[in-house]
A protein has these predicted regions:
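Conserved catalytic/acceptor-binding region of the Class I
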Residues: 129, 144-216
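A short SAM/SAH-binding and catalytic strip from SAM-dependent methyltransferases
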Residues: 114-129, 151
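Short glycine-dipeptide loop
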Residues: 68, 139-144
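A structural alpha-helix within SAM-dependent methyltransferase catalytic domains
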Residues: 37, 60-63, 132-136, 163
Length: 280
């Protein structure tokens, strides 16, 4: 499995791996939902699409916070994650649906959306210009989007700590900043240029900084086990043997322990929040 998972990876093994770690991922990333949903400006009933919805946690939170009469549709390329989202969605709630979709090839919806939102779902497209041009067609004229991406590696030590620990026991290739991956848009100007080229207007990017509870608030040893199991770089240990895995896990646990308070590891994070609109 690549350190830089592309869309095809998420449709297969990467999606399965993420589903297996939803118990820790969703509470860990939940703090990002607050600024993300606030930026949507849900001030009246509207149609909302959650792009790269994963297991549906953010989608369900949007429905809880949206005005009565709103509808929320979640889309993801991973069959495993859509299956999980459907399993947790209320069967008697017609205002929320989940569907399998590859945004780079999916047809433009007949009825466009008033809001588009994505929490860490727009960094993995194989052909970004095509994908963002498609997304522009998903948004109604005058509609608003909010996309979250990770800031720089230096400002997200919970992820760089994993790379450092793994690199102590095996050779880790240099990260390709142009490839699909979590830090693809660490330089926010890259995504702003793509969004501008896709025809979006009123573009802004603001940074959210806060502490994330690793694995949902696990102690250091358990957090290290979770992080290696959940991360794409942890997958590079496959085939290295149990001794290498144990060494990387112990090294990571020691790094995490420096950030443990009250029995839980919490580490700083920086997230870019991009907003804009479709002219009209």
């Amino acid at each position: 499995m690549s350190e830089n998972p592309a869309s095809s990876d998420w449709a297969a093994g990467r999606g399965e791996k993420w589903r297996a770690q939803l118990f820790g991922m969703e509470p860990m990333l939940a703090p990002v939902d607050e600024p993300l949903i606030d930026a949507l400006r849900l001030d009246q009933p509207c149609r909302i699409a959650d792009i790269g919805c994963g297991g549906g946690g953010t989608t369900l939170e949007i429905l809880r916070r949206a005005p009565v009469g709103s509808v929320v549709h979640g889309f993801d390329i991973s069959p495993a994650l859509i299956e999980s989202a459907l399993a947790r969605s209320p069967s008697d709630e017609p205002a929320i649906t989940f569907a399998l979709a590859d945004l780079e090839t999916a047809p433009t919806p007949q009825e466009p959306y008033d809001r588009l939102v994505s929490r860490f779902g727009v960094m993995f497209y194989d052909h970004p210009p095509t994908a963002f041009a498609k997304l522009a067609g998903w948004l109604a004229p005058g509609g608003r989007f909010v996309f979250a991406t990770w800031g720089s590696p230096a400002e997200n030590p919970w992820m760089t700590s994993i790379r450092e620990a793994v690199a102590e026991v095996i050779d880790v290739p240099p990260a390709d900043p142009e490839a699909p991956g979590p830090f693809r848009y660490a330089d926010g100007d890259k995504l702003l240029n793509l969004l501008r080229g896709a025809g979006f207007s009123d573009l802004e990017v603001l940074d959210w900084r806060g502490a994330l509870p690793v694995g949902g608030g696990l102690p250091a040893q358990e957090a290290a086990h979770f992080a290696l199991a959940a991360s794409s770089i942890g997958a590079l240990l496959a085939g290295a043997g149990d001794e290498a895995l144990d060494a990387a896990r112990q090294s990571l646990a020691e790094r995490f322990h420096r950030h443990q308070q009250g029995g839980a590891v919490r580490m700083g994070a920086c997230v870019h929040i991009f907003t804009g609109a479709r002219p009209g």
